[in-house]
Amino acid sequence: MSRIGKRAVAIPSGVEAKIDNGTLTVKGPKGTLSLGLSDLIDYKIEGDEIAVNPANDTQKARSYWGMQRTLVSNLVEGVTEGFSKTLEISGVGYRAQAQGKTLKLQLGYSHDVDIAVPEGLEVKTPDQTTVIISGIDKQAVGQLAAEIRQWRKPEPYKGKGIKYQGEYVFRKEGKKK
């Protein structure tokens, strides 16, 4: 039995949810998100909460149960509060600058790296070594953060690179003579 799946997702005031044609659509103060529903799971809107239960007692349905409940929860949280990820850049000459719908990174390559910001996401650079990505879709926010980090992952000897805020970089000792 899924301990996550058996809890219903509360719908706060100001948020509207509806199910039609295999799609759950959630509207809130920050925007609208939708989720394609799985046939293995039953979704019911009961008053001010969304109940998620397996459609049958197969192993596959039970394994989807908790994940589908979390995806529904992320829709509701996204349209009410939104999501954000913070990246920290460390290294000599490494810097970032947001220019409209483009993020310009200087990461020690012979050229600047320009990353296009997808629709629905916002990128801010409060200073040259911090990048804040925010939006209502948790998957899109995490994907953009991962793509930015991919350009220079933190290296273990000096700790240079792009890392998530709060990420621990395992450090190694250099060669000894």
UniProtKB/Swiss-Prot annotation:
<comment type="subunit">
    <text>Part of the 50S ribosomal subunit.</text>
</comment>
<dbReference type="GO" id="GO:0003735">
    <property type="term" value="F:structural constituent of ribosome"/>
</dbReference>
<dbReference type="InterPro" id="IPR000702">
    <property type="entry name" value="Ribosomal_uL6-like"/>
</dbReference>
<keyword id="KW-0689">Ribosomal protein</keyword>
<dbReference type="InterPro" id="IPR020040">
    <property type="entry name" value="Ribosomal_uL6_a/b-dom"/>
</dbReference>
<dbReference type="GO" id="GO:0022625">
    <property type="term" value="C:cytosolic large ribosomal subunit"/>
</dbReference>
<dbReference type="Pfam" id="PF00347">
    <property type="entry name" value="Ribosomal_L6"/>
</dbReference>
<comment type="similarity">
    <text>Belongs to the universal ribosomal protein uL6 family.</text>
</comment>
<comment type="function">
    <text>This protein binds to the 23S rRNA, and is important in its secondary structure. It is located near the subunit interface in the base of the L7/L12 stalk, and near the tRNA binding site of the peptidyltransferase center.</text>
</comment>
<keyword id="KW-0699">rRNA-binding</keyword>
<protein>
    <recommendedName>
        <fullName>Large ribosomal subunit protein uL6</fullName>
    </recommendedName>
</protein>
<dbReference type="InterPro" id="IPR019906">
    <property type="entry name" value="Ribosomal_uL6_bac-type"/>
</dbReference>
<keyword id="KW-0694">RNA-binding</keyword>
<keyword id="KW-0687">Ribonucleoprotein</keyword>
<dbReference type="GO" id="GO:0002181">
    <property type="term" value="P:cytoplasmic translation"/>
</dbReference>
<dbReference type="InterPro" id="IPR002358">
    <property type="entry name" value="Ribosomal_uL6_CS"/>
</dbReference>
<dbReference type="InterPro" id="IPR036789">
    <property type="entry name" value="Ribosomal_uL6-like_a/b-dom_sf"/>
</dbReference>
<dbReference type="GO" id="GO:0019843">
    <property type="term" value="F:rRNA binding"/>
</dbReference>
